[in-house]
Regions:
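Active-site HxH/HxHxD metal-binding segment of metal-dependent hydrolases
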Residues: 18-84
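Short, charged/polar "capping" segments at the starts of alpha-helices
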Residues: 61-67, 205, 238-240
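Metallo-beta-lactamase
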Residues: 58-120
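Active-site neighborhood of phospho(di)ester-bond hydrolases with catalytic His/Asp-centered motifs
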Residues: 2-6, 27-36, 56-59, 124-127, ...
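Pre-active-site segment of Zn-dependent metallo-hydrolases
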Residues: 1-32, 41-42, 132-136, 176
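Short beta->alpha connector loops
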Residues: 7-9, 36-38, 99-104, 128-132
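Cap/insert and terminal regions of metallo-dependent hydrolase folds
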Residues: 134-232
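Conserved beta-strand hairpin/beta-sheet module of binuclear metal-dependent hydrolase folds
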Residues: 1-20, 107-128, 145
Length: 243
């Protein structure tokens, strides 16, 4: 399952899968969080149609994407989801609403993925939100792996673009770290939050060093010492983990 697919033309997409020992046939679905172009664009639709990969997208998001791209995607490949759980092969997917505005956003969501059958796991995905609600925390409790945006450092924003309000649509380092602490403290599973991927890190308004410093500061105050923080990069592949 792919979570968003906005920056890969077909050939680099295939190459990236090949580096992982996979092919497009191994991808059984693409989940779309919202309608902004870095999450879904023409490349996404071409990949979906070229390899018959279903596109799981909310109706409101599909409507704005269709308008923005001026296209009509193959109806047999479009699966409209809501907040009810659905299956993609042996993975149960639950979508939950997030807070994100601006442009062709549609209706934004985060996701929880859980293994069905013998292989049990829980993965949480939360990016592109201006806040983290108690309902979101509840959804993400006991995730073994969490992908969460840590988009900006407030001081860097104030120094670089004090009049730019776009960053308010994303979690800053403090908000992201606080959310992780809340999720960890509410979890009961022994493997809860073994890995946290800090994602959607702004190249202009943030640095990996600032992300790590804030997460470690918050974890120390909360007496949390068993979470591995993995910094993601917009240009370089993220290390692969096994759960």
């Amino acid at each position: 399952v792919l979570l968003d697919c906005g920056n890969f033309p077909v050939s680099p997409f295939c190459n990236a899968l090949n580096d992982l020992g996979l092919t497009p046939k191994d991808v059984k679905g693409i989940l779309i969080s919202h309608g902004h172009g870095d999450h879904i664009n023409q490349h996404t639709l071409k990949i979906s149609e070229a390899f018959d990969i279903p596109l799981h997208i909310h109706q409101k998001t599909y409507n704005v994407v269709s308008k923005r791209l001026n296209v009509s995607h193959s109806s047999k490949l479009v699966k409209h989801h809501n907040e009810r759980a659905f299956r993609v092969n042996n993975i149960k997917v639950r979508a939950f609403e997030t807070f994100h505005e601006g442009g062709y956003v549609g209706k934004p969501f985060g996701f929880v993925l859980e293994g069905v059958g013998e292989r049990k796991f829980k993965i949480g995905y939360l990016t592109d939100t201006s806040a983290v609600s108690e309902e979101m925390v509840e959804c993400l409790v006991d995730s073994e792996v969490l992908v969460i945006e840590s988009n900006n450092d407030v001081k860097m924003v104030e120094d670089n673009d004090p009049r730019d309000s776009n960053w308010l649509q994303h979690l800053n380092n403090v908000e992201a770290a606080d959310a992780v602490v809340k999720i960890k403290n509410a979890s009961r599973g022994k493997n809860a939050l073994k890995y946290v991927f800090a994602a959607h890190i702004s190249s202009r308004h943030n640095t990996p060093k600032r992300v790590l410093a804030m997460f470690n500061e918050k974890f120390k105050k909360a007496n949390i010492n068993d979470i591995e923080i993995i910094i993601t990069d917009q240009e370089e592949p993220t290390p692969v983990i096994t759960i």
